[in-house]
């Protein structure tokens, strides 16, 4: 444990609980006498380079607690990935401000950022403790049982499809909902948690872990529609064909990519529009509608899992404890124990950074377009208390008089 200042930053997509992790790290840091000041970097590593800091030592505990319960990233975020030159600029600022502890809250790309900064600090012989705090609605961080942000987003998806199912029952047709998830289908699969009755939707769930064939998709939709008179489909934005090419790229001549080289899958309704058009054209079904859940999944106010909030706070607190009491850098990871409880560990950055976790085969039905009971058992405890329920009128039909 050495004297110094703390910097906390948030990276990647906002979530409903990322502020819990930030506040957890800030309040825990303020408990240690060796911590001189606690800074928040505005817009992630870009804020460090620009020396855009907020002094969170001066922030009241009450206001921090209010911010903790507020969705999205209170410090602002970034998608930037530091290279060597970028890291050298980071070190220049960190040294000038005498910062000794760096906590970065984020997902895959953010964990890789922490790894790079950590390695460059070691090369420069600069005493900097670097801890990655997990966050991603995609739930695709390796080693972790699940990641903060995912349970609340999953709760939103489950409730959204529950509502869509009720709407679709009243006015039957085909509904296609596109859900976030580039490589991992956890969030799309969460749509199944909104089902209560046997004929509830989603009736079909398509995940990036399985190859997507357009003709097979249309055939599946038509089979369900012919059998039930309606069909609700949950589709991951990351679905791809047999060659590995994302279906979305078939729509555009130029595909936009972010700073990490990732194809921009979100922020457009193109995939939903494509699938709607294909189903209409090849199946002959007239009433086909599509939606893209988009950014609503990430930080929807009023749809937060209490389990997610608690664990997001705790990974922030544990990050500080590991930094103060330990001698190594790393990533805080979540491990399930028993039916449902969790334990936290500090995992080497190399074991987490830049790696992607996908849904295991045991979570995906043999037919490739549904989930298993194992997945439902895995996810249900994460959604938290107070999930809304839906009911139906009993089918007490009155006999016809005119027999028409």
From Swiss-Prot:
Record-linked InterPro entries: ATP_PFK, PFKA, Phosphofructokinase_dom, PKF_sf, PPi-PFK
Protein residues bound to Mg(2+): 108
Required cofactor(s): Mg(2+)
Site (Important for catalytic activity and substrate specificity): 109
Residues annotated to bind diphosphate: 13
Catalysed reactions listed for this entry: beta-D-fructose 6-phosphate + diphosphate = beta-D-fructose 1,6-bisphosphate + phosphate + H(+)
Name of the top EC class for this enzyme: transferase
Catalytic residues (positions): 138 (proton acceptor)
Chief site of localization: cytoplasm
Keywords, comma-separated and alphabetical: Cytoplasm, Glycolysis, Kinase, Magnesium, Metal-binding, Transferase
Annotated GO CC locations: cytoplasm
Transmembrane segments: none
Gene Ontology molecular function: 6-phosphofructokinase activity; diphosphate-fructose-6-phosphate 1-phosphotransferase activity; metal ion binding
Family to which this protein belongs: Belongs to the phosphofructokinase type A (PFKA) family. PPi-dependent PFK group II subfamily. Clade 'B2' sub-subfamily.
Assembly with partners or alone: Homodimer.
Function: Catalyzes the phosphorylation of D-fructose 6-phosphate, the first committing step of glycolysis. Uses inorganic phosphate (PPi) as phosphoryl donor instead of ATP like common ATP-dependent phosphofructokinases (ATP-PFKs), which renders the reaction reversible, and can thus function both in glycolysis and gluconeogenesis. Consistently, PPi-PFK can replace the enzymes of both the forward (ATP-PFK) and reverse (fructose-bisphosphatase (FBPase)) reactions.
Entry protein name: Pyrophosphate--fructose 6-phosphate 1-phosphotransferase
Originating organism: Rhodospirillum rubrum (strain ATCC 11170 / ATH 1.1.1 / DSM 467 / LMG 4362 / NCIMB 8255 / S1)
Gene name for this UniProt entry: pfp
């Amino acid at each position: 444990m050495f004297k110094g200042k703390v910097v906390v930053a948030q990276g990647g997509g906002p979530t409903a609980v990322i502020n819990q992790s930030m506040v957890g790290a800030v309040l825990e840091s303020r408990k240690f006498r060796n911590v001189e000041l606690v800074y928040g970097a505005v817009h992630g590593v870009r804020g460090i380079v620009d020396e855009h800091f907020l002094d969170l030592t001066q922030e009241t505990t009450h206001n921090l607690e209010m911010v903790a319960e507020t969705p999205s990233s209170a410090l602002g975020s970034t998608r930037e990935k530091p290279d060597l030159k970028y890291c050298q600029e980071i070190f220049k600022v960190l040294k000038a401000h005498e910062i000794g502890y760096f906590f970065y809250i984020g997902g895959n790309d953010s964990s890789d950022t922490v790894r790079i900064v950590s390695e460059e600090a070691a090369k420069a012989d600069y005493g900097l403790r670097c801890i990655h705090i997990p966050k991603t609605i995609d739930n695709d961080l390796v080693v972790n049982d699940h990641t903060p942000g995912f349970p609340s987003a999953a709760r939103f998806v489950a409730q959204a499809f529950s509502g869509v199912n009720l709407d679709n029952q009243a006015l039957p047709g085909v509904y296609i909902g596109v859900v976030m998830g580039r490589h991992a289908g956890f969030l799309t699969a969460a749509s199944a948690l909104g089902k209560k009755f046997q004929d509830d939707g989603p009736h079909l769930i398509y995940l990036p872990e399985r190859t997507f064939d357009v003709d097979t998709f249309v055939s599946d939709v038509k089979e369900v529609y012919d059998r039930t008179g309606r069909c609700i489909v949950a589709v991951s934005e990351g679905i791809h064909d047999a060659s590995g090419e994302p279906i979305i790229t078939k729509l555009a001549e130029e595909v936009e990519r972010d700073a990490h080289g990732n194809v921009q899958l979100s922020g457009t309704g193109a995939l939903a529009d494509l699938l709607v058009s294909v189903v209409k054209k090849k199946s002959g079904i007239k009433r086909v509608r599509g939606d893209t859940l988009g950014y609503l999944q990430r930080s929807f106010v009023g749809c937060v899992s209490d389990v997610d909030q608690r664990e997001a706070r705790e990974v922030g607190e544990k990050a500080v404890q590991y930094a103060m009491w330990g001698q190594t850098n790393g990533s805080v990871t979540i491990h399930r124990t028993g039916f449902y409880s969790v334990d936290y560990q500090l995992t080497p950055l190399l074991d987490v950074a830049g790696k992607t976790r996908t849904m295991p085969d045991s979570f995906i039905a043999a037919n490739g377009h549904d989930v298993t009971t194992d997945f439902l058992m895995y996810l249900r405890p994460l959604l938290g208390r107070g999930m809304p329920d839906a009911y139906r009128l009993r089918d007490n039909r009155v006999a016809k008089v005119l027999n028409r």
